[in-house]
């Protein structure tokens, strides 16, 4: 269920602003998106797993808050990130 260390390191490398950057909103949103996408098939197979669904909803909410922050502080980076992650249609 959890994303592998290698995948996490690759995501951090792809979205970091500078070398060693793991805390920027772009990196955090990309990691949350990977975890959310990893959990989605689980809920298609296990529709009654409400305990894990709550965790998923918390992750979605946290990602939404980070995206709102990024949009408020750096709109250009926000647009680039949602395009790159494919979050908006």
Swiss-Prot record:
Which molecular function GO terms apply here?
A: rRNA binding; structural constituent of ribosome
The GO cellular component terms are: cytosolic small ribosomal subunit
- Alphabetical keyword list: Ribonucleoprotein, Ribosomal protein, RNA-binding, rRNA-binding
The residue stretches assigned to a coiled coil in this entry are: none
Gene Ontology biological-process annotations: translation
Which family does the entry's similarity section mention? Answer: Belongs to the universal ribosomal protein uS15 family.
Tell me, how does this one assemble?
Part of the 30S ribosomal subunit. Forms a bridge to the 50S subunit in the 70S ribosome, contacting the 23S rRNA.
In UniProt terms, what function does this protein have?
One of the primary rRNA binding proteins, it binds directly to 16S rRNA where it helps nucleate assembly of the platform of the 30S subunit by binding and bridging several RNA helices of the 16S rRNA. Forms an intersubunit bridge (bridge B4) with the 23S rRNA of the 50S subunit in the ribosome.
- Stated name of the protein: Small ribosomal subunit protein uS15
